């Protein structure tokens, strides 16, 4: 079995403490001769860790198929110092493969006692927003402009490894170790894509607000910078991200909308006036001019300038923004589009923006 260690310094653009205790995080990646542990072999495991000042990359590679168990045992022992595994698609492939492989040797893997962070799962909700062609590791690396020396895919290296087991070529060994090393070394810089996900909880500051006849344009300062400028839409709003600056354009609706009372059984509908009143007041109205309200007729009208709520927001009669309870209005009872009254105060605008940003990670 080949054991190789490399210590190096490199910046990490994303705060590691957001994943866990930095010194207890273990990035890992495996290389195999196929997708099924029962029909293929594990030949390489790489692990990357950070001690607070520098990175350490460790790799264990089987020089022959019979050394698979040695590789497994070495990695299992190494995991003892860590409590969180960080990987790309490891929940679906790497971890199940290692467990199945270990079972063939009656080995117990420590994964059930460790936290697991699958970066693919974290990034998947961002695919459309970032206009990613697919969610392959190299596609995300290209989006972030992360360079590679390695030009092979894992599948292409299967035949390289099989040739290596027969010839023990240094050149082939280098190709195999390089691919795994770059998969791992590129994970810390790849973490920066999580800043887009973190926008859903990001503290932001409204810098300016410009109202036109039918739009509201808001400029904001973010608590962090995103790695790449991008434009996207969320519901009816347009977003432009540039470093730590966010510009958003919302449509404005001016006119009359209905507010539907949630406890409609407490109301009577007045057909001539086209609105509902509470039963305590309705008792003084001629019974010929009132009807028991239904969910569709228990409403009152409000006129003003309104902002849309994010699409898919559950239909409610009220919501709370910046500590204030605000009525939710619609054109019709069955309308999917919901609105709230526009307020120019900064606290309202910042809370309103968060409503939209929270939909990014869904």
Question: Which residues does each predicted region cover?
Answer:
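Short beta-strand scaffold segments in enzyme catalytic cores
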Residues: 45-47
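DEDD superfamily 3′-5′ metal-dependent exonuclease/proofreading module
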Residues: 1-28, 33-40, 50-362
């Amino acid at each position: 079995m080949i054991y190789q260690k490399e210590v190096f310094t490199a910046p990490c653009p994303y705060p590691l403490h957001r994943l866990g205790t930095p010194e207890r995080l273990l990035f890992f990646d495996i290389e195999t001769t196929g997708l099924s542990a029962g029909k293929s072999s594990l030949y390489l495991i790489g692990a990357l860790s950070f001690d607070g000042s520098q990175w350490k990359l460790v790799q264990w590679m089987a020089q022959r198929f019979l050394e698979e168990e040695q590789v497994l045992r070495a990695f299992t022992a190494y995991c003892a110092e860590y409590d969180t595994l960080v990987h790309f698609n490891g929940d679906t492939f790497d971890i199940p493969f290692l467990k199945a492989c270990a079972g063939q040797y009656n080995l117990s893997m420590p994964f059930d006692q460790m936290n697991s962070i699958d970066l693919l799962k974290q990034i998947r909700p961002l695919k459309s927003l970032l206009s990613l062609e697919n969610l392959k590791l190299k596609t995300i690396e290209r989006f972030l402009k992360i360079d590679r020396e390695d030009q092979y895919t894992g599948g292409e290296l299967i035949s390289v490894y099989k040739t290596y087991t027969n010839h023990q070529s240094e050149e082939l060994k280098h190709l195999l170790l390089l691919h795994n090393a770059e998969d791992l070394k590129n994970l810390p810089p790849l973490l920066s894509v999580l800043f887009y996900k973190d926008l859903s909880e990001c503290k932001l500051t409204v810098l300016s607000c410009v109202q036109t006849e039918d739009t509201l344009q808001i400029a904001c300062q973010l608590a962090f910078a995103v790695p790449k400028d991008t434009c996207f839409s969320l519901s009816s709003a347009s977003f432009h991200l540039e470093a730590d600056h966010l510009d958003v354009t919302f449509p404005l609706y001016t006119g009359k909308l209905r507010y539907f009372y949630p406890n409609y059984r407490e109301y009577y509908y007045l057909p001539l006036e086209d609105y509902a009143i509470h039963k305590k007041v309705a008792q003084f109205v001629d019974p010929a001019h009132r009807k028991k309200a239904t969910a569709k007729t228990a409403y009152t009208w409000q006129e003003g300038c309104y902002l849309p709520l994010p699409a898919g927001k559950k239909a409610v009669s009220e919501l709370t923004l910046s500590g204030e309870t605000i009525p939710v209005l619609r054109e019709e009872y069955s309308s999917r589009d919901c609105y709230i009254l526009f307020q120019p105060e900064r606290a309202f605008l910042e809370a309103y923006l968060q409503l939209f940003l929270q939909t990014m990670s869904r």
